[in-house]
């Protein structure tokens, strides 16, 4: 399932004013993919078909001026990719050209449940990577404080 700009803006609108996306924000997108893997088995979770952001969201990612976006999927963007000429093309645009931090495989279930319960989708979030000199990616320990 390809998540489009329309899906993102509709979700923000449905969640209300505490879900407004502002410059510098870290946006979290929960698809339920990690929950499904826990329930049904890991199978092809890492490498198989998965919901994720459509390549068409690149303009929204840039125009919104967010600092980062993270999902509960293994690859952030929809798999299989929307066209065959490039592997994970949204990565190829978002990282070097937008300068966007991408988070993958984030466990968002407890946070999503808490947000739905109190109707507040705004919180302080930190996700410091382990310090590895010269690395282009590293595990993080995300912490949300409401």
What are these regions (language model features)?
Residues 1-146:
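Active-/binding-site microenvironments in catalytic and ligand-binding cores
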């Amino acid at each position: 399932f390809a998540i489009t700009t329309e899906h993102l803006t509709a979700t923000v609108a449905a969640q209300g004013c505490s879900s407004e996306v502002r410059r510098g924000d870290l946006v979290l997108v929960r698809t339920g993919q990690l929950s499904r893997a826990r329930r049904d088995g890991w199978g092809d979770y890492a490498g198989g078909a998965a919901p994720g952001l459509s390549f068409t969201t690149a303009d929204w990612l840039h125009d919104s001026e967010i600092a980062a976006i993270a999902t509960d999927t293994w690859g952030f963007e929809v798999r299989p990719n929307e066209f065959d000429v490039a592997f994970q093309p949204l990565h190829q645009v978002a990282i070097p050209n937008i300068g966007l931090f991408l988070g993958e495989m984030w466990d968002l279930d407890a946070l999503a449940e808490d947000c739905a319960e109190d109707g507040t989708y705004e919180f302080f979030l930190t996700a410091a990577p382990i310090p590895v000199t010269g690395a282009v990616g590293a595990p993080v320990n995300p912490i949300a404080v409401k």
